[in-house]
Amino acid sequence: MLTKRIIPCLDIKNGRVVKGTNFVELRDAGDPVELSKIYNEQGADELVFLDIGASHEKRDIIEHLVEKTADQVFIPLTVGGGIRTTDDFRRILRAGADKISVNTAAIHNPDLIKQSSELYGAQCVVVAIDSKRHYVNEEDLDSKQLEDKNVVKVDKNKYCWFEVFIYGGRKETGIDAIEWAKTAEELGAGEILLTSMDADGTKDGYDIELTKSISTHIKLPVIASGGCGAPQHIHQVFEYGKADAALMASILHYREYTVGELKKYCMDKNIPMRL
């Protein structure tokens, strides 16, 4: 059985790590280089570095910070935010990234996934999907407007489909997240980074229904993101959400747990982890 991965996430704004709730109300969480060093020493399996304002502000990613961060870590580093072209891929890989995460640009130009995969290998291409629940009334389930949507029953009498958002969660697309994940797989993506905007920063647990819906429709590894507030949430997203990796921020940035403590909890629940 493949080992599951614990991945700290560094959301960067103005050169600092920040954390918010539902993609807003950001507050400072520390220095990215220092935090990267700490998580590397604690035994994180990978790191994700996201320049969260780059796409919305239509600017390039902060390259020097990528270089400084890459100098401190000896585990795979995924970098995203403001990646628009295959040249951006090359530049950030040269700066020290092992994988590149694309989100907004891939929606506007899906061929970017294919071209980057062919140039640098599928293992370098991570497609990030920011998704939000779009609730549907039971009497509307047969509506023509839902013909291209994967409607999921998420509670006793609750139904929804999962909508893709871009520009750091600022703009809705009308695109179904399950269909977009399947398209990304067909185009040559190597991994999906799946964030629940509803759960983000709440610390109430991952969106299990969202994660499971994506994981069971594709063969690619799925990294679950958004909502981690306790070790049991990680166990749940592995066990019931069928995620391959769990991304987290607040729980680590504010020293509530170490990576090692989270891994031990999962191993005690018979989840295979790398020590």
Swiss-Prot record:
Gene Ontology CC annotation, any one: cytoplasm
Function summary: IGPS catalyzes the conversion of PRFAR and glutamine to IGP, AICAR and glutamate. The HisF subunit catalyzes the cyclization activity that produces IGP and AICAR from PRFAR using the ammonia provided by the HisH subunit.
Record bears the keyword Amino-acid biosynthesis: yes
InterPro entries given in the database record: Aldolase_TIM (IPR013785), His_biosynth (IPR006062), HisF (IPR004651), IGPS_HisA/HisF (IPR050064), RibuloseP-bd_barrel (IPR011060)
Broad class of the protein's primary localization: cytoplasm
Subunit structure: Heterodimer of HisH and HisF.
Pfam families: His_biosynth
Keyword Cell membrane annotated: no
Enzyme Commission number(s) of this protein: 4.3.2.10
Intracellular or extracellular location(s): Cytoplasm
Active site per the UniProt annotation: D11, D130
Family classification: Belongs to the HisA/HisF family.
One BP term from GO: L-histidine biosynthetic process
Keywords, ordered alphabetically: Amino-acid biosynthesis, Cytoplasm, Histidine biosynthesis, Lyase
Protein name listed in UniProt: Imidazole glycerol phosphate synthase subunit HisF
Record field: catalytic activity: 5-[(5-phospho-1-deoxy-D-ribulos-1-ylimino)methylamino]-1-(5-phospho-beta-D-ribosyl)imidazole-4-carboxamide + L-glutamine = D-erythro-1-(imidazol-4-yl)glycerol 3-phosphate + 5-amino-1-(5-phospho-beta-D-ribosyl)imidazole-4-carboxamide + L-glutamate + H(+)
MF terms in GO: imidazoleglycerol-phosphate synthase activity; lyase activity
Pathway the protein acts in: Amino-acid biosynthesis; L-histidine biosynthesis; L-histidine from 5-phospho-alpha-D-ribose 1-diphosphate: step 5/9
Species this chain originates from: Methanococcus aeolicus (strain ATCC BAA-1280 / DSM 17508 / OCM 812 / Nankai-3)
